[in-house]
Amino acid sequence: MNLIYSHNYTTARAFALNLGLVPGDWKWINDARVLKDYPRADIHRVSHWEANPHRADIDAALHHAKKAHRLGTLTDYSRP
């Protein structure tokens, strides 16, 4: 599973289409629960991810997953 950390669904969907991912291969990280539902998933952080309305909860879940060794690859596409 590919999880996309962006500020909204539209941006996540555009990113997924650009990578050639089809529905079912990816999910937008809209809250911290998504990280718990898909342990060890690959995470793609895209532009404006910091504007996600649930950023504090998501970042805490990312930190917890990293400490528990339940975090897949985190790729940051938000920087040029």
State where each predicted segment sits.
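Short, flexible loop motifs at catalytic/binding sites
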Residues: 1-80
